[in-house]
Amino acid sequence: MRYKFKTQEDLVNHLKSVGFVFANSEIYNGLANAWDYGPLGVLLKNNLKNLWWKEFVTKQKNIVGLDSAIILNPLVWKASGHLDNFSDPLIDCKSCKTRYRADKLIESFNKDIHIAENSTNEEFMKVLNDHKIFCPTCKQFNWTDIRHFNLMFKTHQGVIEDPKNIVYLRPETAQGIFVNFKNVQRSMRLHLPFGIAQIGKSFRNEITPGNFIFRTREFEQMEIEFFLKEEIAYDVFDKYLNQIQNWLVTCCGLDLNNLRKHEHPKEELSHYSKKTIDFEYNFLHGFSELYGIAYRTNYDLSVHMNLSKKDLTYFDEETKQKYIPHVIEPSVGVERLLYAILTEATFIEKLANDEDRILMNLKYDLAPYKIAVMPLVNKLKEKAEAVYNKILDLNISVTFDNSGSIGKRYRRQDAIGTIYCITIDYDSFGDEHDPTFTIRERNTMAQKRIKLSELSLYLSQKAHEDFQKQCQK
């Protein structure tokens, strides 16, 4: 019998205790809603980014990569609209001093109330008054006026804090792609349709960050700007919709029952979008946005072309026409997807002997360690280390664990997602050149004795079996 952690706090405490995440600046009482990634978190995060890149870039014939700077010319943000419009409606409860985003306050009261992204302060207040929306914290109806708060982090470039030297930490990675559109297209001799992919840090001075790593002020994005003719935009949109759903389930291990699609009604669409669909995941705090696909039309290239006075059109050699390409944008936050995967994979299992174990059911490609090597007793440590070193040479992510009883070591590895535990015992070295060992599978706890020379084939066969099972679901 398996059951999930009851609260977000329980899950976070487990992840902190085993080295996935730590509270930022913890020895100084932390920094609100900021997190550092520990040794296991780094491995999992890198595995996730590599898995995404492999699926959406490496395996595609018309996608290339880019790594643009975090600090861009401020005119980029002027053209994109971020300087003037990238803000949240801020409201405070006068009674308890709790601060909210007005749109999220309304949404948490009733998700069926649709508020346009560009709603005025007066329109927000009208909804609050009409529905008599009380403060969730103190249950009072005592609001300040709404004011807008720009989400971009402002700093200065150079030694003098002069208004002329103001720059911003990028709030999204997309604009770095758009301003490099022509550079990439020319240098790589690309023909439409093609995409530019990027993984990178973004920064938003969120009014109400929270829910662990779901919404933080510093985060990482994985996204593609796919440039194409307008006529095929909706077909490509649907292609990405299907590909992303399949990848989330098959490669990331998310349960399809915990995913749902939300198409933004017209009044909720961003100013640049003609169509947006979000995959929402059932987090411990409820369904929330996980992975978005937006049809950005030719808005971004058009505004940059207008302000920069540079030609960002594409010349179609077949039709002999010049036009501004349209764009489909699939985008996901690394931390948000990481949180969904950890929520899905981590649970408590009641065993036949009435003992509980924490099990992190991560996919093979995501697991921080594929194998843990363990000597049965400490006097076999040296021989176990020899096997460990040989597995390292196979380019497999492996850890060495010789602390505590063998049962405790199994439980420890189960709780961090290690796929296999290899135990070196007294029968392991009948053949010094090709030692044998028991290999224990995480989910089933089934054990089998194999030779070191058989390990690569064994892992390949197990991976194929797991893939076949997934395809049959």
UniProtKB/Swiss-Prot annotation:
Its main location: cytoplasm. Keywords: Aminoacyl-tRNA synthetase, ATP-binding, Cytoplasm, Ligase, Nucleotide-binding, Protein biosynthesis. GO terms for molecular function: ATP binding; glycine-tRNA ligase activity; protein dimerization activity. ATP binds at residues 204-206, 214-219, 289-290, 333-336. It is an enzyme of class 6 (ligase). One of its GO terms (biological process) is glycyl-tRNA aminoacylation. GO terms for cellular component: cytoplasm. It catalyses: tRNA(Gly) + glycine + ATP = glycyl-tRNA(Gly) + AMP + diphosphate. Its EC number is 6.1.1.14. Substrate binds at R101, E172, F219, E220, Q221, M222, E223, E329, P330, S331, V332, G333. Gene3D superfamilies: Anticodon-binding domain, Bira Bifunctional Protein, Domain 2. It is found in: Cytoplasm. Disulfide bonds: none annotated. The keyword Ribosomal protein does not apply. PANTHER family: DNA POLYMERASE SUBUNIT GAMMA-2, MITOCHONDRIAL, GLYCYL-TRNA SYNTHETASE/DNA POLYMERASE SUBUNIT GAMMA-2. Homodimer. Belongs to the class-II aminoacyl-tRNA synthetase family. HAMAP family: Gly_tRNA_synth_B. This is Glycine--tRNA ligase. It comes from Ureaplasma parvum serovar 3 (strain ATCC 700970). The gene is glyQS.
